Structures are given as C-alpha cells and as structure tokens.
Amino acid sequence: MTFLNACRNGQKSIVQIFLKKGGIDVNKRDAEGNTPLYYACLKGFRDIVGLLLDSDADVSIANNCSETPLHAAARSGNKEIIGKLVQYGAELDATDKEGRTPLICLLDNKRTDAALFLIEQGADTEVADNSGHKAIDYATAHGLREVVTCLSAEGTSDTRGNTPLHQAVFNGQSETVRTLLTTSDNMLNTPNDEGETPLIIACMKGNLTVAKLLIDAGADVNKALP
C-alpha cells in the first residue's frame, strides 16, 4: 500500500500512520500527474484533505491535464473542501487544458452553492474556456437562476454570437429566460452570427411558452433571418 493509494482510497487511518512515520513526499505525483491531495479532493475525502493540507501539501500543483486540486474539488462539488483549499491559497482562476476554471467546472456540474461561494471569494467570472464559453453561459445552459442573477450578462456572447438569452431559449429554460429578461432587455432582439434572434430560435424549437415570454417582453416579431 502506497501513501498515494491510501489517500485515493479514503483510508484515513493508514494515511495517518504514513504521516506519523514521516519521510513521506506528500506532493508525489503518479503517471497522470495527480497528487494525493488531488485524489482526496476528487473523491471528497475531507478529513484526508485536512491532514494533507496540515502536512504542507501544495494546493497549486497541476496534473498532466493542467487540473489543480481545486478543479478536482469542483468535480466532486464538496463546498467544505473547496473552502479549505481557498483558505490555503488555492488559485481560483487556474485553467485546465480545456481552458476551464474551477468555477466553470462547478457550473457545468450544477453545483450552485459552491459556485456562488467561489464567486464571493473573487473568482473571475469573465474567463472564457477554449470554446469561448464563460461562467454565465454555463449557468444559463443549466438553468442555474441564482447564478444567472448574480452575474452580469451584458455584452456576453459565445464564439457563434449566441448570448445567454439565446442559450436559455435553445435549451428551453423558461425560468432562466424570465430571469434574463428581468436583468436586461439588451439581448432581446440581438441576432447571433446566423442572424437568429432568441424569438426565431424559440419558434424554430416550437416552444410557445418561451416565445410568448419574449413577445410579452417586446421582442420584434417582424425581424427575419437575413
């Protein structure tokens, strides 16, 4: 049994034995570049995370995919572990090989509370991943209304010119559409790169509920595709 495997398997008592014995490299990486801390964060083993951090585990070491322990914690969604990593100086806006920050990972996993916590801690909401998507785009796509409300969607669009409103309409997120409409009306008649307005997309999708919301908000019913 290696120290790294004990951390990965959640064997707290064995981890304690290794640490008490001493001479352990708490930051030793495996072939994938993952550290004991990375695995403990990924699996949600908060007690082991605490032991490792108290033993000077490095919160900034990234694996071969440029994922840090905070990325791993974002995948497991454990808010307590995320808070602990932040307390020990984890980089909030580190990006993995896909350009995703821990915040984006949290939103993609629909972890609203933990995402709001990272935003409160100062996570950059304007970082775009390699696909051009920002935090607001993920929050919109997954219907995370609390996050949508706290983020500014002004002037935000993806690589195809789709605004958060386009995305909410495309995904049939009627409550998110309602939230975005109360936040700003600047996106209401904005076309994407294909010339499609949110209303056109709603009609193409046959979503009468969303179409009515847009029309009631003042969407231009005469705007046509170019």
Residue ranges of predicted features:
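N-terminal segments that cap or nucleate solenoid repeat domains
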Residues: 1-35, 160-190
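Ankyrin-repeat-protein effector appendages
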Residues: 2, 121, 130-133, 137-171, ...
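Ankyrin repeat domain, specifically the short helix-to-loop turn at the C-terminus of the second helix
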Residues: 17-24, 50-58, 83-90, 116-124, ...
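A generic tandem-repeat structural signature
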Residues: 57-83, 87-91, 96-100, 104-108
